[in-house]
Amino acid sequence: TFNEAYMMHTTPSPHYGIVASTETAAAMMKGNAGKRLINGSIERAIKFRKEIKRLRTESDGWFFDVWQPDHIDTTECWPLRSDSTWHGFKNIDNEHMYLDPIKVTLLTPGMEKDGTMSDFGIPASIVAKYLDEHGIVVEKTGPYNLLFLFSIGIDKTKALSLLRALTDFKRAFDLNLRVKNMLPSLYREDPEFYENMRIQELAQNIHKLIVHHNLPDLMYRAFEVLPTMVMTPYAAFQKELHGMTEEVYLDEMVGRINANMILPYPPGVPLVMPGEMITEESRPVLEFLQMLCEICAHDPGF
């Protein structure tokens, strides 16, 4: 209860570092100099996209892919059209959604464009942990995708560092190095479990669990029907303040009103809000959470 109250009444807004950064960015965007900065970011992002495609074409076996149209020569936001297949969305309205060139989404093996699962897969969470070991922070991680933002602070050196880290990961993965050598932070979470495990075994362990639960279908069903809103988040928080809550196991959530937000990370998107209740109709939400718990129980650190 204390933690919930603290998070509700505190904010990073007055943080001087954030305020200074915002003011500096606003000043940098003024006039033609700001336009040059933005154009430079777009150009670097497009060059990075093309380099990933080139490496994918020249690589033996697998390599990362980029979520983007076939033709990216124009420096503009690319529309997601209903007659295109590259984006994987169905029944969308034309001119409704666009892809920002500076938002680069890399794809790892495991899921086809039509949502079917492959026999071979490398969950993106493993790649994200490897990049973190090398000082590269991923903006958002999905099951088989990684989002990077080519903002005005990303120069050529940083883009090359990311490329080098990705190629190093492929090389280490293909050599099937030990987890403790590739992911020392993960190894320290459970040294006994990861002592002799190699990176390909770890990837296949998680990938098989995702295939077993048929993740694309599960995610579709989980977001198709939202949990039922029984009371407002404020009313749910008042219940907690007055000690009118209890802890229950995840398996017992159906028919119970949530007092707290459930927010799996990554990607950090709330699945259940305070005051909402999972019903039989929204049970896929619970099944998705159970799948995440099973992965974590099977492979510590995930």
What are these regions (language model features)?
Residues 32-302:
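Non-catalytic terminal extensions of PLP-dependent enzymes
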